[in-house]
Swiss-Prot record:
One of its GO terms (biological process) is spermidine biosynthetic process. This is Polyamine aminopropyltransferase. Catalyzes the irreversible transfer of a propylamine group from the amino donor S-adenosylmethioninamine (decarboxy-AdoMet) to putrescine (1,4-diaminobutane) to yield spermidine. It is found in: Cytoplasm.
Amino acid sequence: MELWYTEKQTEHFGITAKIKRTLHTEKTDFQQLDVIETEEFGNMLVLDGMVMTTEKDEFVYHEMVAHVPLFTHPNPKHVLVVGGGDGGVIREVLKHPSVEKATLVEIDGKVIEYSKKYLPSIATALNDPRVDVQVDDGFLHIAKAESAYDVIMVDSTEPVGPAVKLFEKGFYQGIAKALKEDGIFVAQTDNPWFHGELIRKVYADVQEIFPITRLYTANIPTYPSGLWTFTIGSKTYDPLHVEPSRFYDIETKYFTKDLHKAAFALPRFVDDLIK
């Protein structure tokens, strides 16, 4: 008998993967958590029925969340990751030699626990001495912080359940306060095919708070539609105008210095969302 997992991405569309077995399933205090072993994409983390990451394509998302802001900022020392309990963004953050401390604030400790167990290649950096892992509410953490971080990365789930408030204007205002005077933040902002209005709203909210606001994209096969967006807000530095000398060699599979700029070249229908 064949086993297949389907993520219903809209009322009329979804993606399906053939699975070998279910590795773990649990209703945590915050969400339904499943880890499944798939034929095509390796181990897959699923939260509330939505694919969060897979062993095969995880590097695209994690590299694009981390390296775009970290190459934009000339000297990022203190970095905060909100969400991201799988550890992939933290792994990429630590590739930058200027980073002295990376704080991870994940609301659901079970995500951290089972990522370490079933996604070790992604969670590999969570025990690094430069990393401060806190099982806490990222929204509350931001509210208490002031001029504390050079770069903040919001690696949230979709805007449902505990992540809803991470897409609100008040949260972005809190981020601006938590950043240093030349700080940068980035957030994943879903896909333009099914959630164009969300992108439009988030971009407008961020633009009211940060003098430099940009949208960029990446191609992630297991995410809805495959085309994913990220919104970056900066107090000082423009990600479109990074001096070539600021780029240095790090080990990546997707990100390059040329792709850094190219990612901001938007399809017209996406660009129209933010005009």
